[in-house]
Amino acid sequence: MSDSFYRYDVIVIGGGHAGTEAALAAARAGARTLLLTHNIETVGAMSCNPAIGGIGKGHLVKEIDALGGAMAKAADLAGIQWRTLNASKGPAVRATRCQADRNLYRSAIRRIVEAQPNLTVFQAAVDDLIIHNGAAEGDSVRGVITQTGLRFEATAVVLTAGTFLAGKIHVGETQYAAGRMGDPPATTLAARLRERPFAIDRLKTGTPPRIDGRTLDYTMMDEQPGDDPLPVMSFMGQVSDHPTQVSCWITHTTEQTHDIIRGALHRSPLYSGQIEGIGPRYCPSIEDKVVRFADKTSHQIFVEPEGLDVTEIYPNGISTSLPFDVQLALVRSIRGFAQAHITRPGYAIEYDFFDPRGLKASLETKAVGGLFFAGQINGTTGYEEAAAQGLLAGLNAARQAQALPAWSPRRDEAYLGVLVDDLITHGTTEPYRMFTSRAEYRLQLREDNADLRLTGVGRAMGLVDDARWARFSSKQEAVQRETARLSALWATPGNALGREVVDTLGVPMSRETNVLDLIKRPELSYAALMRVPTLGPGVDDAQVAEQVEIGVKYAGYLNRQRDEIARQQRHETTPIPEGFDYAGVRGLSMEVQQKLERVRPQSIGQAQRIPGMTPAAISLLLVHLERARRSQVA
């Protein structure tokens, strides 16, 4: 093999949702990239729930897509049941979710990975990092060493190990080392990382038992069909991309289920002290639900198909690590599950994660230059959160290899910006999940405008290909053209257009009104307006029509939010130099100094969001930074 086989710009460790997006982003950005995975067959595998999107999560998927990522495209090719959540609410909180055929999804991701120029995939477990100990410039990564002793060199390395770092599975009293059921853990790599100056702790997550769908009685459940018309996830997607559609089903636990669980809590690793890691608050185990909500006589379960060509179903809502005999009893006590056959047991898994306050906004570690972390190892939960971090880390790894400045979106620019800022500023003690409520500027950060917010940025950094750019540019021009067309038209009580509006829509017309302003009326929409003969038929692209309508209906709110953002941005990006001496700022309390030393914020904006930070402390920092700037100029 030639030396070039062992030398890359960027190496990505792990082929899950974070790893694939990281490798694809680095390669799209022009870096020669190597993706190392312990098993090529599991690249893009959905380890837990076979679904993509949801509240907050769908927003991240749209942002990944707007930046040229793969997740939305794969979801469109694999989604077998589609829903728009919060459809009756405002556009800021509407979210797309699909039930996915896990085999179709994995195959789609693998095809995308294998077709990507600049990207090489190699099957190998990584046991160690090659770290250069620089006396002056600090530690920096130089490559990796595999389980078989191969050494691959790179300028930047992205670690996306998921639950594999010292992973330990629990089923009742039984526990054993694993990355997920059926896969070995990264034990040696975890031990090597613990020798480095990283703050490491343990988290846990879990998954429910899988069931043979042929053994269920669906007559005892409520059918949950998908939406009609079907949504799409990718801005490049079409409904024709979707495979055959199927329904999900809803059932409930019973009082017998809860009695079985209560009677076996002493055998639960969650309650016996066997599991030390903290689990996800918003995806609790069925044991947790029964204990925490003791007054409830039943809990809802979503019966979700795993795919079109398999019989397994995913019972969403009964994640458990109880012993198998208890799992079988509790499953068979659920409505419609009396004859259920379990195909795989549920389990909990504990794993190492790193305090994300040890990361820069680029997701590069502060301790080791050129080393980036993404995904569950940063304390998050969920495919979407992992994939979004992967894209950002992969992009910035490529930019570092090319000696370009790092990029990270602000909180007002993307949910990805909210996610990263929350992690690196506040850290986390439990698996972090994205919600729309975490974003203070969510009216600006909608699913529908993710491309308008990010595709231009992605194009400038090499993430967006010509086809996506052409589609985006065409859409942007169409929105501007249609908005201009309607804004040039006026309806009055006495002119022909005004009479058409009154006759067609049945709305009163007492004064001259701009046609665009008609859309601001709660009872009117763009589609309704296009029924007026002179105005219709309008644009046939639903995305364009949606942008025209939202831009008009919410103009006042959006303008106010932009003004608020402008005020906030005054000092948001004021940089704080690396290695800044907080002890040298006179007037800072010891408590504030300790908080600042712990987080080491990169900007005044980040410093402002540290819990317990006071306006007075920020003022002192600004004064000190300004003095330092003036002294340098002088």
Curated annotation (Swiss-Prot):
This protein's GO CC annotations: cytosol
UniProt superkingdom: Bacteria
UniProt subcellular location: Cytoplasm
InterPro entries named in the record: FAD/NAD-bd_sf, GIDA_C_N, MnmG, MnmG-rel, MnmG-rel_CS, MnmG_C, MnmG_C_subdom, MnmG_C_subdom_sf
Annotated keywords: Cytoplasm, FAD, Flavoprotein, NAD, tRNA processing
Binding site for FAD: G14, G15, G16, H17, A18, G19
PROSITE patterns: GIDA_1 (PS01280), GIDA_2 (PS01281)
Residues that hold NAD(+) according to the record: 279-293
Gene3D superfamilies named among the record's database cross-references: FAD/NAD(P)-binding domain, GidA associated domain, C-terminal subdomain, tRNA uridine 5-carboxymethylaminomethyl modification enzyme MnmG/GidA
GO BP annotation list: tRNA methylation; tRNA wobble uridine modification
GO MF annotation: an example: flavin adenine dinucleotide binding
The protein's required cofactors: FAD
Family of the protein in this entry: Belongs to the MnmG family.
PANTHER family tied to this protein: GLUCOSE INHIBITED DIVISION PROTEIN A (PTHR11806), PROTEIN MTO1 HOMOLOG, MITOCHONDRIAL (PTHR11806:SF0)
NCBIfam families (UniProt xref): mnmG_gidA
Annotated function: NAD-binding protein involved in the addition of a carboxymethylaminomethyl (cmnm) group at the wobble position (U34) of certain tRNAs, forming tRNA-cmnm(5)s(2)U34.
HAMAP family named in the record: MnmG_GidA
Quaternary structure and partners: Homodimer. Heterotetramer of two MnmE and two MnmG subunits.
Name recorded for this polypeptide: tRNA uridine 5-carboxymethylaminomethyl modification enzyme MnmG
Gene name, Swiss-Prot/TrEMBL: mnmG
